[in-house]
Amino acid sequence: MDIEVELIETGGRESINFFPNKRSRAFEPLYESLVENYSSLNRESIPYQRPSILYVLPNNIGNLLGTVEVLMDWKRRMGYEVNYVSSSAIVNNANNLKNYIETAYEAWDNPPEYVTIIGDAEGSYDIPTHFENWSGYNGEGDHPYATLVGNDLFPELFVGRLSFDSQSHLQTIISKTVNYESNPYMGENWFKRAALIGDPSTSGVSCIITNDNIKEVLQNHGYEDIRTVYGGDFPSQMTNNLSDGLAFFNYRGFYGVSGYTSADVGDANNGFMLPIATVITCGTGSFGTEESISEAFLRAGTASNPKAAVASIGTATLGTHTMFNNMVDMGFYNGALV
């Protein structure tokens, strides 16, 4: 049976004035997930750029630059081209910083695929973030730094933030990151272990259903020890599971994280058995004015005795909604593993 499909477009088409000269391998998994039969394309003749990272540093980085250079040197050894900017005229103004990133993306021979902001959005080592003005909550976030071409919300590169407020924070974060990638703790099978926490008391049973979905994804990808916490003393159970060492730590519940605070994060005793923490509920990613619990996960411990997590994902503002949080949560694990 033959099927013929005719596509008729209506309406105007946005004019895109820029296309990169070379394709980024970092986006290949996304294309494969979105484009039917993408794997059947012959990509041997496609020119790909060299992997590239741009670090954005506070203008007063001073003698802390040596700490950051440990991370930059490791990335170079991994094969990345590494650049950084710390000019006060650029990093102290969100619009100027976005313009700099956009110029780098469009004009550099080897543009950045990743932009890592090293600094808090407030405090002694601040680099501004963006605040949206359409929800009424003034939510902060760095995503606008990645939307460089067109009027859509799709990113042209990957952006993240290593948020620190002190020399100790920075040393801890760099130690966590470099050791996680270059010298992971191999003493036991912690990297096949996960803890999934769902509190239905306010946001409803969908928090448990979300975690059950994530559990199935993890099981399908070889995770052998998956702990679920759906009731009882949430803070103590979260601390105990973190201390055992995890690959993933996931929370779905309501504002306040079921009584688990930034101070509780520091009670974990997991050393270099550091998970990626996804704490998807109101306020967990509100880093614009004070320390959020996501920042606490990243900063906890010391360079030689780290705690909590190597990375953390949260959501900003007190105006998030259960159904959307559930989708973000399940979507992360589907995107990371599937």
Task: Please annotate each region the language model reported.
Residues M1-V338:
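Cysteine-dependent hydrolase recognition
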